[in-house]
């Protein structure tokens, strides 16, 4: 009898502890970061000088949606698969890209704030161009390659062309 009682008490605890939690349990939350007025002005001047039109997000990120996509919008805990090209707005130098095959996958919450704010603006299959100020990008610190060569100087403004291939 004691064994059955123990089993009846233990079973719900085991089931609850093994059940899938909600998305808030993923460990990531929405960042409240936003661009400064100086950063916003820089991007506005860049867009104007290059005859580009973009929409300003409430965070100070600017974007153009080339294709809105059709299904599944990314959330902070979503696994996203993308193809992308990242370049420096100052000189157009491409510092990173992944445009081959099925793309590369990340948890959105692991990425820079600019991507966290921008990718949910499109759906699965969509394409977006993001103009990201330093405060929503890599910040004040240099980013180096595997050889220690600086590929993204601190306080860089970044442009990413992104194809959101899949959202899970």
Feature roles, as predicted:
Residues 1-18:
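Sec-dependent bacterial lipoprotein signal peptides
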Residues 5, 18-168:
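Cross-family detector of peptidyl-prolyl cis-trans isomerase
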